[in-house]
């Protein structure tokens, strides 16, 4: 007799894994929105030094990293939640806030992990379509919030569409969300978003919204994707405590903590790398438009493009792969006929545009 699994397993969608990790070195990896820059040398050195102590469990209080983040953003450490990547925090938030009979509201397409929260908890997931410019339709989202809504997710900049909401739009929306409902503003790509001004701007929203969390990561601008370090800045200690209550112990390893603390200390280098990425993003967008593609106004470290003929998506993705260029197909992210393309090195970007010129 086969093993009987829980009913929720049948509801949870599989995460769309990126391909290419076993294809060798001569591949342009433009599918996972990683940084094309290595971590800062001090972050690498800190992680290496920390390896000598991994016979011991990590510091379960994570105080050095909490304090470093608190000092940077002016947030008390007890209102900062950490995680093994921001996905870890998202899933824990779902476990803490959702249950059968509750509701979760988010735009779609958005980050591929969002559907897991409702499916795993048995909560009703309400997916609100993006508007005609592939941006969040905040009016439509607000209209879906009820007394049963426990959690609202806003991905800004949005993954996979790269589009952003201005701070005043977000602030107005938050004023329409009842206090019983938690809001996670997923800001994984905020460092690249010129429309937001700077990474401190949205932190001010926490002063008047105790139900709000700003979810961020070291995987993108800081180049620590392989170490998996995410963090959330919470409007209240109660929200942080509820999420931590459902966590496994020792969820953030010692080298990752050490590297993240060091990475925070080199903001000038982070800003230089972000500026380089933004410049390359503009060039890549212009190149795609020159090939007849519609390209969203990106505020991330990737671009989102609609192909001139949506029916050739699979052919284009396959042709790029044959030429050693890996991108993410829109059909795997909720919108057929599109591509999500990470900003890579200058050589990788040129290789991608050259391949697209051959295929279109």
State the predicted function of each range.
Residues 45, 49-84, 281:
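Conserved N-terminal alpha-helix of the aminotransferase class I/II PLP-enzyme fold
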Residues 211-296:
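PLP-dependent aminotransferase class I/II
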Residues 1-56:
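N-terminal "arm"/small-domain region of PLP-dependent enzymes with the aminotransferase-like
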Residues 168, 311, 318-328, 332-360:
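PLP-dependent enzyme catalytic core of the Aspartate aminotransferase-like
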Residues 96-154:
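PLP-dependent aminotransferase-like
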Residues 119, 136-147, 160-183, 187-221:
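Active-site pre-lysine segment of PLP-dependent enzymes
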Residues 278, 290-323, 339, 343:
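Conserved PLP-binding catalytic core of the aspartate aminotransferase-like
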Residues 63, 77-101, 228-230:
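Conserved beta-loop-alpha segment that forms the PLP phosphate-binding cup at the N-terminus of a helix
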